[in-house]
């Protein structure tokens, strides 16, 4: 009797395509996890978990941290550490996402206060992410950098 129940359950899983393994996250779910964690630390951990070793990260021309950085260490040093040390409450608030094949676009608003001047800003922004085999291989930022630069003066 027990054997027939086990065989029946096994057949049910096989025939229904069910698996006992965890579901692979979609590209959209991966990118959302880098923005929508409970804390900035959680977002950072999710980013680190999903970036390819040789990720290419491009900050927009005209933006204070403009340039292309390769690898998470370079990105952390040239972008995230500076955002954390030079700004108060700097954040990206996603409005929505668009996903197609290997690309995900997140668009929304940056806000923050520049520590040196005490000036705040709001800027519209879009992030274009590209993934391969569930790893983030590139990021490109498009932003109204004028409002950001105005806060620096």
Residue ranges of predicted features:
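Bacterial Sec-dependent N-terminal signal peptides
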Residues: 1-26
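A beta-strand edge to alpha-helix "cap/lid" segment located at domain peripheries
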Residues: 19-23, 77-153
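Short acidic-aromatic low-complexity motifs
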Residues: 25-54
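Generic anion/oxyanion-binding catalytic loop in active/binding sites
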Residues: 20, 36, 64-65
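A solvent-exposed, acidic/Ser-Thr-rich amphipathic alpha-helical stretch
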Residues: 48-99
């Amino acid at each position: 009797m027990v054997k027939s129940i086990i065989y029946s359950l096994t057949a049910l899983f096989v025939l229904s395509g069910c698996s006992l393994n965890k579901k692979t996250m979609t590209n959209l779910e991966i990118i959302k996890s880098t923005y929508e964690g409970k804390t900035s630390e959680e977002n950072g951990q999710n980013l680190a978990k999903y970036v390819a070793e040789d990720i290419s990260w491009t900050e927009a021309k005209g933006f204070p941290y403009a340039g292309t950085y390769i690898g998470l260490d370079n990105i952390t040093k040239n972008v995230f550490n500076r955002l954390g040390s030079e700004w108060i409450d700097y954040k990206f608030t996603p409005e929505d996402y668009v996903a197609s094949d290997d690309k995900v676009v997140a668009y929304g608003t940056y806000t923050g206060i520049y520590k040196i001047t005490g000036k705040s800003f709001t800027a519209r922004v879009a992030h274009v992410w590209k993934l391969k085999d569930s790893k983030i291989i590139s990021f490109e930022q498009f932003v109204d950098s004028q409002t950001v630069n105005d806060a620096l003066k």
